[in-house]
C-alpha cells in the first residue's frame, strides 16, 4: 500500500508490516462507519496523528521501560484506540479491550476478526467499575490505559485497581497544569499510587499538546475502589 500523507514522525516509529496493518485497520473502520457512527477520525491526519501516532508514541517515549510481552488493558476502548494500535506494535502482548457500549465492543470484535493480529485479544462489554471487583481482573495487568474518557483523577480510580504491583497506568492528557497535578497527587494518595514519570509532546501536523502521565501502585489499591458506577465521574476523589 502507498504511504501518501503519513507523517514522517509515524514512519520513524513503526515497521513496514505495522504500516500495512494500520492501513488495513483504517479501511475496516471506514467500512464500519458506513453502518454505525463509530468515530469521525478516519481520514488523513485525523487517523494517522490523532488515532495512530497519539496511541503509540507513549510506548516509544519511555525508553527505560519495557512495554513488550505484557498484559495490556484499554478501558473505554471506543473504536479500539489505543488498544488495537498497541496490539499492532506489541504483537507478543495479551490485550483486553473493554467498553460499556455494546455497539462499540461489537465493532471492535469485527475489527479483530478482520485484521491479522498476532495477539490474544479479549473484548469485553462491561463497566470497569464492575470488572475491577472481579478477582480474575483486579490487580491482573502490567499496563492499563484509557484515552478521552475522563479527568486524570477519575481515570486513576479506574486504572490503579486493575494493575499488578509492578504495573503502569498510562494517562493521556492535554495541557497539564499545576492544579491538575495537585489534584492527581491527592487522588493517588488515597488510591495508594504515585506518579512515576511524565512526558509532553507537540503532536505532528499542529494537532496540539499531549501529556502522558505514568502512574504506578505503591501498594495494592484499597478494595472499595473503584466506587459504584457513576461515582468516580460525578465525585472525583
From Swiss-Prot:
GO CC term (a single one): cytosol
Sorted UniProt keywords: Cytoplasm, Methyltransferase, rRNA processing, S-adenosyl-L-methionine, Transferase
Keyword Cytoplasm: yes
InterPro entries from the UniProt entry: rRNA_ssu_MeTfrase_G, SAM-dependent_MTases_sf
EC number(s) stated in the UniProt entry for this protein: 2.1.1.-
GO molecular function, one term: rRNA (guanine-N7-)-methyltransferase activity
Keyword Iron: no
Location(s) in or outside the cell: Cytoplasm
Binding residue positions for S-adenosyl-L-methionine: 76, 81, 128-129, 147
Family: Belongs to the methyltransferase superfamily. RNA methyltransferase RsmG family.
Free-text function comment from the UniProt entry: Specifically methylates the N7 position of a guanine in 16S rRNA.
Name of this chain's protein: Ribosomal RNA small subunit methyltransferase G
Source organism of the structure: Prochlorococcus marinus (strain MIT 9215)
Lineage: Bacteria, Bacillati, Cyanobacteriota, Cyanophyceae, Synechococcales
